[in-house]
Amino acid sequence: QMCIRDRNNPWFMILTLIGSFGSLGLVYWKRHNHPTNLYMLGLFTSVESVALGTLVSFLDQTIVLKAIIVTAFIFLGLTLFTLQSKYDFSHMGTWLYWSLLILVGTGLVQMFFPYNHLFELAYSIVGCFVFSGYVIYDTWLLQRRLSPDDWVLANVSLYLDIVNLFVSILRLMNGSSDE
């Protein structure tokens, strides 16, 4: 069998993780070289879709569908709010950056400890807030600060915001259904 079909193969997840970071680096490196930037964006999107597809293959279909719908409504609402808002969201960048670092660090530390349902719940809720903040911040950057030449980076930023918000909502819904 191919390793893609074997969901329990840890090497597959490691390869998709390496592929995600590698293709993200290539997108950043070639962001101003047209049409190479399109190929790199396609590669990044493909690798991310394989990783996300593998993740959702472990979960109940109804939970995945609910998470997709909730993510879509949250993203649409936050985007519309940001586009019509007169607020300056530039101050959010530093807070979001440090929140993300704390979230990643906490997740890495948690890998070495036994599963804790309350920690998973809190981690998912914080993730939802952080990535909702990133949707607002990156939409504001796209609208007010980024030049038209930076559309590839803006695309990747919003894509990662949506994917990470979806994964946080998915973790939250999956954790609440396990009770």
What residues fall within each predicted segment?
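A hydrophobic alpha-helical transmembrane-helix feature that marks the membrane cores
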Residues: 1, 5-179
